[in-house]
Amino acid sequence: MANRIKKGDQVVINTGKDKGKQGEVVRVEGDRVIVSNANVIKRHTKPNPQAGVAGGVVEREASIHISNVNIVNPATGKGERVGFKVLEDGRKLRVFRSSGEALDA
């Protein structure tokens, strides 16, 4: 099954502590996505001079399950569900389910 959400998509978070936040998808890892400036966690790291890493508390984005985000429709500004439409030449095209307009050109 092809992913409905890809890197670079603008998404809105549906559930959790960051509900309602919008951001860009930085990375897709299977059924999880990493959204910029959302689900930020703190990790305590040890210094590693060989790798050039200074120790301390580092903030970074944690992954969110793909079912907890929706793609933002530029026309409405709201998060909407996405489906697929198969073209005559066999290509799959992502479309918004509410309006049927194409997400990819």
Curated annotation (Swiss-Prot):
One MF annotation (Gene Ontology) recorded for this entry: rRNA binding
Protein keywords: Ribonucleoprotein, Ribosomal protein, RNA-binding, rRNA-binding
Matches recorded under Gene3D superfamilies: 2.30.30.30
GO cellular component, one term: ribonucleoprotein complex
Subunit and interaction comment: Part of the 50S ribosomal subunit.
Protein task: One of two assembly initiator proteins, it binds directly to the 5'-end of the 23S rRNA, where it nucleates assembly of the 50S subunit. One of the proteins that surrounds the polypeptide exit tunnel on the outside of the subunit.
Protein name: Large ribosomal subunit protein uL24
Species for this entry: Xanthomonas campestris pv. campestris (strain B100)
Primary gene name: rplX
